[in-house]
Regions:
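Intrinsically disordered, low-complexity Ser/Thr/Pro/Gly-rich regulatory segments
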Residues: 1-70, 75-247
């Protein structure tokens, strides 16, 4: 019987191992500044798991006459022409974009507020319901409880929809109409403590969203079991709900 929990934890272990290997060459003074390394590490992991019909880049997204801020990771369809491409740097029309991710070395309340604000604005410019995530390799202790960060997330109201605060904390936006165990009474972000599984669940949710966007159907059962191996679902590991502000 496959051990899918161990497999998902191995994704976290692999990302942490590569991060630490690079960190051996870069002292603490420069580690926080040099975000590009972390983007490359995560981009490489995504390419290993995403279907060949999509690509991963970095750059900007254009919708009508509006331009996003620079986005760390853009997942886009290969069957759309790009406006510009040079190696991994792209300028993409919004219609081609399936997901965007902001990558952070370590989430603190202040860093999280700014990241959520920027990702929300980029999501509004793109103007479509896509995977919009924030991925942090490390997290300050329970920074998701900070009132200012929670307020920024509540105001995003689902535009930012997946967040990973280190290897153990995963946040996902849920609408009340979605059937699940122990739901909040209004649209909200659920905060889950899932040891060594947050990285894997973040990537799994991205893959699932892209599969649905491309094929209009849910994941096959075998993939669903592999991507979400927590027995009894992750709802048993929910720590909190953050209710959203009505848009």
């Amino acid at each position: 019987m496959p051990d899918y929990t161990a497999y998902q934890k191995s994704i976290s272990n692999e990302l942490i191992s590569i991060k630490d290997r690079v960190r051996n060459f870069i002292d603490d003074r420069h580690w926080g500044e040099d975000g590009r390394y972390k983007e490359i590490i995560l981009s490489h992991a995504l390419r290993q798991h995403l279907p060949e019909s999509v690509s991963v880049g970095t750059g900007f997204v254009v919708n009508n006459n509006s331009l996003t801020k620079q986005i760390d990771i853009i997942v886009y369809r290969n069957d759309f022409p790009l406006m510009f491409k040079q190696d991994d740097f792209i300028i993409a029309p919004s219609e081609s974009v399936l997901g965007i991710i902001e990558v952070k070395s370590k989430i603190t309340a202040q860093v999280g507020e700014k990241a959520i604000r920027n990702a929300t604005e980029n999501g509004r410019i793109i103007g479509r319901n896509i995977f919009n995530g924030i991925f942090a390799f490390e997290s300050q202790n329970e920074c998701f409880n900070n009132p200012c960060l929670r307020n920024e997330l509540a105001n995003s109201a689902g535009i930012v929809n997946h967040l990973c605060f280190g290897a153990d904390i995963f946040l996902k936006y849920w609408e009340t109409s979605y059937p699940r165990i122990n739901p909040c009474t209004q649209d909200s972000y659920a905060v889950y403590q899932i040891e060594k599984l947050a990285f894997g669940y973040f990537i799994s949710n991205l893959i699932e969203d892209i599969h649905i966007a491309l094929h209009g159907q849910q994941l096959p059962n075998a993939l669903n079991r592999m991507f979400y191996p927590i027995e009894g679902t992750k709802e048993a590991h929910k720590k909190a709900d953050i209710a959203v502000v009505e848009r």
